Amino acid sequence: EKTIADAERCMRELPDDTVAAEYLTPFSSGGVSFDVMANPKLLEEAYNLDTTLIRDLVVQLQLEYDYLIIDTTSTFSALNLSLMDLSTVIDFIGIVDFIPTIKNMKRGSDALKELGYDDNKIRYVLNRSNARTRINVKDVEAILGHQFHYVIPNDFQTAAESIKTGVPLVLSAKDTPLAKGIRTMVDTYEEDTASPQKSQEGGWLSRLFS
């Protein structure tokens, strides 16, 4: 299995001959197909990824695909900032299970403002919203200065099973509140970015979240 570290290594050694799509792993289930670029296998590889080279790989893929979904770490590293600059939408995901996580969310929200990102580019997402906690969501929104655009229900068992099997839960557990919450969120992205013609035809994203 090829990883993003392998793609970055090739980009460094053979910049003119590197094809990012060759480092993707195809996935197909239930009539839905998409491609994934796997994480580095080694921790040191993850820490040593070159920002410029990764950015070049992403730009290549942007020319090949209608949608790219990038799962970043929860830090404002040079790499993550570069990827956010390339993004159409930034999902700022948080959990309000205890005070330290709320403080981290506040710091992250403030950092996004200081970095000058347009509010229309950022979507605030509350994850595991019905987890047992005495913290009032409205209080958290007041602290952040933003309402949550999307609320994703808490369903640890369904999420864990999806991770274990490697099958997206929107396919394997499509009738659960968790899957429905994710589909609702993604539907708004399609409405914002898809042209009328593409919306009528329906792409893999539509099939995945339908």
Q: Residues of each region from the PLM?
A:
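Phosphate-binding loop that captures ATP/GTP phosphates
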Residues: 1-36, 150
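Phosphate-binding/switch loop-helix module in NTP-utilizing enzymes
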Residues: 33-80
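Inter-motif core of Ras-like GTPase G domains
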Residues: 60-63, 77-98
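NTP-binding/hydrolysis catalytic cores, primarily Walker-type P-loop NTPases
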Residues: 164-210
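Beta-strand-loop-alpha "switch" segments that mediate conformational coupling across diverse proteins
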Residues: 128, 141-169, 182
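G-domain G4 guanine-recognition motif of GTPases
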Residues: 95-97, 122-134, 151-158
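Conserved C-terminal guanine-recognition region of P-loop GTPase G domains, centered on the G4
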Residues: 102-121
